């Protein structure tokens, strides 16, 4: 049975898009992925991730959903939380690729609830588990593509801000990202900043 793996990158970032990737791995091709060294993207070097992502895109059918910072802010303003934003993105991929079975990294604290919602909305046989990117090689493959795609977006944005010291990884814990944000007032924030994030809201309240 062909299996679709889905994972995301950039969920907690204050800068840049949330990227969701889906990869269909044909039956028995998981052995090939193991030989290629496919594992959770966070355990790979950026260079290795780039190489593997290119190979995976050539070898397998895949799909990407890129949700911009502005779209995230707009949806949150409409009362749609981050888990729902991710679910909507995953459902687009499930609809586009229409697999026999899908395995996804559960974003809801209750994995079974998330699994049932995806399955009911799409009619696809879905398995949703926490840490699926560690436990299922199909999800690891999706993780690699999602992370590489997001890294490419961040690198492109960074080009315009090198003279300011760069934007860092885009995550709130990154000192370079924190420093970058201090260059702007809340109203001056570039459109790739998630203004609805607590990190930025705190800056607004302190100005």
Curated annotation (Swiss-Prot):
GO BP field: DNA replication, removal of RNA primer; mismatch repair
Cystine pairings recorded for this chain: none
PROSITE patterns xref list: RNASE_H_2
Cofactor (UniProt): Mn(2+); Mg(2+)
Keyword Lipid metabolism: no
EC number in record: 3.1.26.4
Reactions it catalyzes: Endonucleolytic cleavage to 5'-phosphomonoester
Keywords from the named record: Cytoplasm, Endonuclease, Hydrolase, Manganese, Metal-binding, Nuclease
UniProt-listed InterPro entries: RNase_H2_suA (IPR004649), RNase_HII/HIII (IPR001352), RNase_HII/HIII_dom (IPR024567), RNase_HII_arc (IPR020787), RNase_HII_hlx-loop-hlx_cap_dom (IPR023160), RNaseH-like_sf (IPR012337), RNaseH_sf (IPR036397)
Cellular component, GO, one term: ribonuclease H2 complex
Residues covered by the RNase H type-2 domain: 1-207
Enzymatic class: hydrolase
Annotated positions binding a divalent metal cation: 7-8, 105
Transit peptide among keywords: no
Any one GO molecular function term: RNA binding
Top-rank taxon: Archaea
UniProt remark on cofactor binding: Manganese or magnesium. Binds 1 divalent metal ion per monomer in the absence of substrate. May bind a second metal ion after substrate binding.
Compartment list: Cytoplasm
Similarity section: Belongs to the RNase HII family.
Biological function: Endonuclease that specifically degrades the RNA of RNA-DNA hybrids.
Cited PANTHER family: RIBONUCLEASE, RIBONUCLEASE H2 SUBUNIT A
Name of this protein: Ribonuclease HII
UniProt organism field: Methanobrevibacter smithii (strain ATCC 35061 / DSM 861 / OCM 144 / PS)
Gene giving rise to this polypeptide: rnhB
